[in-house]
Regions:
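Rossmann-like NAD(P)(H) cofactor-binding subdomain of soluble oxidoreductases
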Residues: 52, 62, 70-145, 149
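Short pre-catalytic strand/loop immediately N-terminal to key active-site residues, enriched for Gly-Thr
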Residues: 128, 177-183, 235-240
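NAD(P)-dependent Rossmann-like dehydrogenase/reductase catalytic/cofactor-binding core
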Residues: 7, 12-16, 218-286
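Internal alpha-helical scaffold of NAD(P)-dependent oxidoreductase catalytic cores
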Residues: 116-126, 142-180, 193-230
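NAD(P)+-binding Rossmann beta1-loop-alpha1 motif at the extreme N-terminus of oxidoreductases
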Residues: 6, 10-68, 72-75, 141, ...
Length: 286
């Protein structure tokens, strides 16, 4: 029944796809809000969370059904989004083993591999692994997705529709690259925040007050990002256009190069990817 409804909803491009969220934290709330903004009915969305506060907050804010346990009504969905913490996933999935039909199960838990999730679900394979990032909380995220080979085109489209509610999506062909997704875009906002923090500190060191320094840092970063998105040129070309020979920008960039800025960024992202692989090994242990 769920599989037939999923196929029908995708083929007709309507908004009647039934979606249940296992976990009601910030990312689940962002997805629910984004889906409603995209035209999904609150009546087609449900959330399951042990926290009474979380349930009350979701019900009050979005008008969705929010329950403490995954009952039959919540399980009668086309898509099940796993939005619990990675360390809690195994225990959360135990009651689901053997109860799933053809639902597309989407995991947004960092580090967890589909083989482990599928094993905890009793050999289930209709699985999609995703890595959103925190700008999804304001609908400006980017999410990398990987689908188990058994997931058909309709299932992939269903997963894509869910995650595109909070930003852009990028499909990854090899699950091993999901650790790289985590390193580049999942952790990426922290790198940008660190840059903003440093630019603000530099502004204050030059005499601006906190409010002025923050405004310069924030709006410069935002404007540069918007320009890069809007331009057909590469970031390298845009950088070169700002850099006049013998000018202030060249002096700044030469200082950054001398400090090892480029190599430090490469090393940081590589460290994040390596840690992601380690976490996958640790989290997947029985």
């Amino acid at each position: 029944m769920a599989a037939a409804r999923l196929q029908a909803s995708l083929l007709t491009r309507d908004k009647n796809m039934k979606i249940t969220f296992l976990g009601g934290g910030n990312m689940a709330a962002a997805l629910i809000g984004g889906l409603i903004e995209k035209g999904f009915s609150a009546g087609d969305l449900q959330a399951v969370d042990l926290s009474a506060d979380s349930r009350e907050r979701l019900a009050a804010r979005f008008g969705v059904r929010a329950v403490e346990a995954l009952d039959e009504a919540a399980l009668a969905c086309d898509v099940l989004v796993l939005a619990v913490k990675p360390q809690q996933m195994k225990a959360a999935l135990a009651p689901l083993a053997g109860r799933l039909g053809k639902q597309i199960v989407i995991s947004i838990a960092a580090g967890l591999r589909l083989a482990d999730i599928g094993r905890w679900l009793g050999g289930y394979t209709q699985l999609v692994r995703c890595m959103p990032n925190t700008p999804a909380l304001i609908g400006a995220g980017v999410t990398g997705l990987y689908a188990d080979p058994s997931v058909d085109a309709a299932g992939r489209e269903a997963a894509g529709r869910v995650l595109s509610a909070v930003g852009s999506i990028v499909w990854i062909a090899d699950e091993a690259r999901m650790d790289a997704v985590t390193a580049v875009s999942g952790s990426g906002p922290a790198y940008v925040f660190h840059f903003i923090e440093s630019l603000e500190a530099a502004g204050r060191a030059l005499g601006f007050d906190e409010q002025q320094a923050r405004r310069f840092a924030l709006d410069t970063t935002l404007g540069a990002a918007r320009l890069a998105v809007a331009s057909e040129e590469s970031p390298a070309v845009l950088r070169e256009r700002v850099t006049s020979k013998g000018g202030t920008t060249q002096a700044a960039l030469e200082s950054l190069a001398a400090s090892g800025w480029h190599d430090a960024m490469l090393a940081a992202v590589a460290a994040a990817e390596a840690r992601g692989r380690e976490l996958g090994d640790e989290l997947g242990k029985d």
